[in-house]
């Protein structure tokens, strides 16, 4: 008897996705390069419709045609090696789905190469971590649409469900579109986390709040317009005590790790010419956090103001909340502008409002305000920037004074706020009809004869700036 779908790679994500698929009524074949993980899967899957295999040949032959194979192996060379091993065993029309944390450019390359072998290829972003993989992730599949249609029922079944019952999956677009959108999703996630961390720093360093008060603040915020998974778990984190009944978070070394997708997002923005300042500052913030020894030494050598606050703490806490929400809006505005430009350049025809909808559940950046993004693009499909949507425009108009005050207070007290600072600078730059770039153009023309355009007449000009 043949199985309906196969999963290669039985680390935690592959294993949990296989169980998720099986729980929706599908029969699943599994294979792992090391047989020990396959044996463990068998032991843990008693009573489930999971079919173990111990060679690629056995695995491929166990699947109904056209074969549907989900690859959950390490991104990069391991994925290429697995595909190369599979190719001689596959038939025309079989479907490979790469659910790994893959660079979208690799997906474009693989899509093109496999098309020549008549193999359908889907690059699919998977968000939600190991729990999401088991209970329902947000899925971002890209590739041939006809191939997607053949696996749509399975993906729809295993995806997270929003409160209105809609599955958090949709066809994203051709070739690398799915993994590209997942990359930007991860970049936005970096910014969300950095902005929340800066809010915590202000509460702790400036307002002197206890971990209990910080936890309660995030729980209160999660009941309003900031409602989101990351705000929710932040409240939980501050309630967790260690073996000494002290806040565990305060014992964690302040060096933030990363897997590189935030960096990919920033590099791509540079290539596109898109200002992705908030996400990029969030990547840099992780870099500077990683040089702990240098920072400790610098703290003994470099002086600055000592944080102190003698104002109304309740009032300032509300300003932090507003600063966080406005900065979040600016960050998403940048991320969606990046996806809009990439869609145009690659002819992906991304439906930006639909992307917001599939992030409502299952993924790390799930948040209440994603519905507002969907509404914005429904009202104006050609919207250039989320800040120009009436809802978001009203919010940033009302909240900008709070953000300015938070940034200024942070600077005056030596509390770093790279994300908040980048947000207000982006907002002010974006709304500026005139920027001092005219001087930069004059300088470029002065030393390099790069020429310039003028406001008052047509043409391209060069000036001899000093007389010989």
UniProtKB/Swiss-Prot annotation:
Reactions catalysed, as given in the entry: 6-phospho-D-gluconate + NADP(+) = D-ribulose 5-phosphate + CO2 + NADPH
Enzyme Commission designation: 1.1.1.44
InterPro entries recorded: 6-PGluconate_DH-like_C_sf, 6PGD_dom2, 6PGDH_C, 6PGDH_Gnd/GntZ, 6PGDH_NADP-bd, 6PGdom_BS, NAD(P)-bd_dom_sf, Pgluconate_DH
Binding site for NADP(+): 9-14, 32-34, 73-75, 101
Catalytic residues in the record: 182 (proton acceptor), 189 (proton donor)
UniProt superkingdom: Bacteria
Pathway it works in: Carbohydrate degradation; pentose phosphate pathway; D-ribulose 5-phosphate from D-glucose 6-phosphate (oxidative stage): step 3/3
Enzymatic class: oxidoreductase
A GO BP annotation: pentose-phosphate shunt
Keywords noted in UniProt: Gluconate utilization, NADP, Oxidoreductase, Pentose shunt
Molecular function per GO: NADP binding; phosphogluconate dehydrogenase (decarboxylating) activity
Residues holding substrate: 101, 127-129, 185-186, 190, 259, 286, 444, 450
Function: Catalyzes the oxidative decarboxylation of 6-phosphogluconate to ribulose 5-phosphate and CO(2), with concomitant reduction of NADP to NADPH.
PANTHER family: 6-PHOSPHOGLUCONATE DEHYDROGENASE
Subunit field text: Homodimer.
Protein's name according to its UniProt entry: 6-phosphogluconate dehydrogenase, decarboxylating
